[in-house]
From Swiss-Prot:
This is Nucleoside-triphosphatase THEP1. Keywords: ATP-binding, Hydrolase, Nucleotide-binding. Belongs to the THEP1 NTPase family. ATP binds at residues 11-18, 100-107. InterPro entries: Nuc-triphosphatase_THEP1, P-loop_NTPase. The keyword Chaperone does not apply. Gene3D superfamilies: P-loop containing nucleotide triphosphate hydrolases. Has nucleotide phosphatase activity towards ATP, GTP, CTP, TTP and UTP. May hydrolyze nucleoside diphosphates with lower efficiency. Pfam families: NTPase_1. Its EC number is 3.6.1.15. It catalyses: a ribonucleoside 5'-triphosphate + H2O = a ribonucleoside 5'-diphosphate + phosphate + H(+). Coiled coil: none annotated. One of its GO terms (molecular function) is ATP binding.
Amino acid sequence: MQTRLRVYITGEPGVGKTTIFLKVIDKLKSQGYSISGFYCPEVREKGQRIGFKIKSLDNEVEDWLASIYAKSSIKIGKYYITINEDIINKIKEKISKSEIIGIDEIGPMELSVPKLKEIIDYVLNEKPIVVAVVHRKISFKDGKTFVVTYENRNRLDNEIFNYIISSIQ
């Protein structure tokens, strides 16, 4: 597979970007594609967001990315970055073996962690096919960007999946 394809998913907070991303990843997996990467779901406590985890797409690797309770030298907004370097190494190892890479999200928090930024740069520069959720204030010149809205979110996963399949076959 020599195709170079970049698919970016963006939109306002809470519109459904992660849901669409995970649906697209599941559809690609069901077609037999080798996929790895990571996503960063929020963690809530009593209805309030307290931080973010980082999970590999196969859910075998998981740890905290950032938390309001942790203390570290890197702080983004109210969150302290707490990611463990072992987790990053495990995710990087998985990524090196896959043909399609999924990332949720490429945003200020993820880019503030040097080792995580290194993985993101590696993926964007070296891997042939990337599907990524991108913070609404970040844009890339290469690839196709899909903007999630309340009006299109129920059909956008199919549109993105069909675009990817037609681009790589």
